[in-house]
Amino acid sequence: MNNMVLLKCKNVTKTYKTNKKKIIILNNINLSIYNSETISIIGDSGSGKSTLLYLLSGLDNPTTGKITFKGKEINKLSSSDRSYLRNKNFGFIYQFHHLLTDFSVLENVAMPALIGNFSVKHAKNLAYKLLLEVGLKNRINHKPSEISGGERQRAAIARSLINNPKIVFADEPTGNLDNTSSKKFFCLLKKVNVEKKTAFLVVTHNIKLAKKLDKTLEIKNGKLYKKNL
């Protein structure tokens, strides 16, 4: 890891209003993510882990505070500029795979590269190589409904890496994987981390996985704490 800060959030708070009552989900969060750093986020269900991922990745706006990527304030960008920044620099692995049902596994994985104006041939070549990495060589032409839940999640992992992102945001990436596939995910994560210097921010309940990352942070009562596992 080097000391280049990729993403930084400063004094970030997120609140919601329900029945005229203000609920504080995240309270004055400060965090820096460095180039090639791997971070796990743990905490109880409903503690705000996924909310933090959405804020950091520009999918949602903080109520107060500032989030910057390479010094550029994300929530001040136009919708189109923010989408461009996300597609070019961020990869996403959601708790639910969000694969498009009418497209093949190969086409799903290639989609972000096609949105990024890669040629169809180049995008599919990249997708094919990643699908080999995650053990889905024999599933490339299948529709998502024709493969298992674990295989769909592996396809989603491959999709997150296709644009060679600077940061991958992962929300319970091993939640639908068996032990063998979880180990393969970690090996792939480390391989990409070492070779591409990709940073990973991983929300997980998998303590074994959390222990293997550079550091672990815990959200508790809306605050972010460093956790020693």
Curated annotation (Swiss-Prot):
SUPFAM superfamilies membership: P-loop containing nucleoside triphosphate hydrolases
Mention one GO biological process in which this protein takes part, according to its record. lipoprotein localization to membrane
Subcellular location field: Cell membrane
Per UniProt, the enzyme's principal EC class comes to: translocase
Q: Which domain of life is it from?
A: Bacteria
Q: What is its EC number?
A: 7.6.2.-
Cited InterPro entries: AAA+_ATPase, ABC_transporter-like_ATP-bd, ABC_transporter-like_CS, LolD_lipo_ATP-bd, MacB-like_ATP-bd, P-loop_NTPase
List keywords of the entry alphabetically.
ATP-binding, Cell membrane, Membrane, Nucleotide-binding, Translocase, Transport
All copies of the ABC transporter domain together span 7-229
Keyword Translocase among record annotations? yes
* Gene Ontology molecular function: ATP binding; ATP hydrolysis activity
An example of a Gene Ontology cellular component annotation for this protein is:
plasma membrane
UniProt keyword Membrane, yes or no: yes
What is the topology of this protein in the membrane according to its UniProt annotation?
Peripheral membrane protein
**Residues engaged in binding ATP:** 43-50
- Summary of subunit composition and partner proteins: The complex is composed of two ATP-binding proteins (LolD) and two transmembrane proteins (LolC and LolE).
Query: What function does the entry list?
Result: Part of the ABC transporter complex LolCDE involved in the translocation of lipoproteins, in an ATP-dependent manner.
Family under the similarity heading? Belongs to the ABC transporter superfamily. Lipoprotein translocase (TC 3.A.1.125) family.
Q: What is this protein called?
A: Lipoprotein-releasing system ATP-binding protein LolD
